[in-house]
Regions:
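Class II aminoacyl-tRNA synthetase catalytic cores and aaRS-like
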Residues: 1-208
Length: 208
């Protein structure tokens, strides 16, 4: 399938920013197709980006013909851009949807997918690890990283207010200085070097 060029298109909103207050406004969103439900006269496309999901509603009798035809080619995990009008609705959990006026297919995914990105069909851990990129797109996994981020950010802020500073110790060292630890030699600008195994020695010096 021939994909479209992004061209002059630039995202105006993330999915989490599409709210009922934008009713009647034109927006441009970018993301991946998470799910598709085709009911004949109406097609629902759930688009996901890093912030969450938003529903794209294609009405066969009201949506431009070229948009209807293009959405017929969509499959899960296709990368798309959607330009359309925000509409308030009580039919979605978030109370909002986007009625598209133009759709661009920016990338395609090879099918069948190794796992169900909707989560309806559970996958065992081996499958999830083999398809880690897809697995990490699940909201449950993304939430873990967000919690970690907030916790680390709060910890850094707390310690910074107490006068602590954050340092980054070397990751590549010039000589074997870590006792009996297994060493991993690397060529670094035509010189022998090693990957540091532990920041212990550097942190001991900083404490002093």
């Amino acid at each position: 399938m021939k994909v479209d060029s992004l061209g002059e298109w630039r995202r105006t909103h993330y999915s989490s920013e599409i709210k009922p207050e934008l009713d009647g406004k034109e927006v441009l969103v970018l993301g991946w197709v998470k799910d598709i439900r085709d009911l004949g006269a109406i097609r629902f496309i759930v688009m996901q980006d890093r912030e969450g999901t938003v529903q794209i509603t294609v009405l066969r009798k009201k949506t431009p013909k070229e948009v209807v035809e293009k959405t017929e080619n969509l499959q899960r995990q296709y990368c798309i851009g959607v330009k359309g009008i925000v509409k308030k609705t009580e039919m979605t959990a978030r109370g909002v949807e986007i009625v598209p006026s133009e759709v661009r297919i920016l990338g395609v995914a090879q099918h069948p997918l190794p796992l169900d990105v909707t989560g309806r069909t559970p996958s065992d851990i081996d499958v999830r690890l083999d398809a880690r990129v897809l697995d990490l797109s699940r909201q449950e996994n993304r939430a873990i990283f967000r919690v970690q981020h907030v916790a680390l950010e709060a910890t850094r802020g707390f310690l910074s207010k107490l006068g602590f500073i954050e340092v980054q110790t070397p990751r590549i060292i010039a000589s074997a200085t870590e006792g009996g630890a297994a060493l991993f030699p690397v060529d670094y600008y035509d010189k022998q070097a090693y990957l540091a195994q532990s920041p212990q020695l550097y942190k001991e010096q900083l404490v002093i």
